[in-house]
């Protein structure tokens, strides 16, 4: 498929699982002789939630919760049909969100 590019965006709360998944995708794509750019680490989304510890008073006592979303980007340049078939068969761990653009 000349001139075509597949962009894969991965998101997860756990960066270790995310890096493992990115490594699997890169290995599969390289085994089918596709050109690869990445995995490129994108900025981590960080959300902070502050909650009162008690139900109705003691405003000075608060608890903080944080949610981080780690992201990686992988570009597969000029993929073959063999590459696409191999990517469809990959079994990734739960907790990894995969977004694919052609």
UniProtKB/Swiss-Prot annotation:
Organism whose genome encodes this protein:
Pseudothermotoga lettingae (strain ATCC BAA-301 / DSM 14385 / NBRC 107922 / TMO)
Q: Which GO terms describe its molecular function?
A: structural constituent of ribosome; tRNA binding
Listed InterPro entries: Ribosomal_uS10, Ribosomal_uS10_CS, Ribosomal_uS10_dom, Ribosomal_uS10_dom_sf
Q: What is this protein called?
A: Small ribosomal subunit protein uS10
The keyword Electron transport belongs to this UniProt entry's keyword annotation? no
Q: Which UniProt keywords apply?
A: Ribonucleoprotein, Ribosomal protein
User: What's the stated role of this polypeptide?
Assistant: Involved in the binding of tRNA to the ribosomes.
Pfam families assigned to the protein according to its UniProt record, in alphabetical order = Ribosomal_S10 (PF00338)
Gene3D superfamilies linked: Ribosomal protein S10 domain
Entry's family note: Belongs to the universal ribosomal protein uS10 family.
List GO terms (cellular component aspect): ribonucleoprotein complex; ribosome
Complex and partners: Part of the 30S ribosomal subunit.
Q: Does the keyword Ribosomal protein apply?
A: yes
- Please list which residues make up the signal peptide: none
Any one biological process term the GO annotation gives: translation
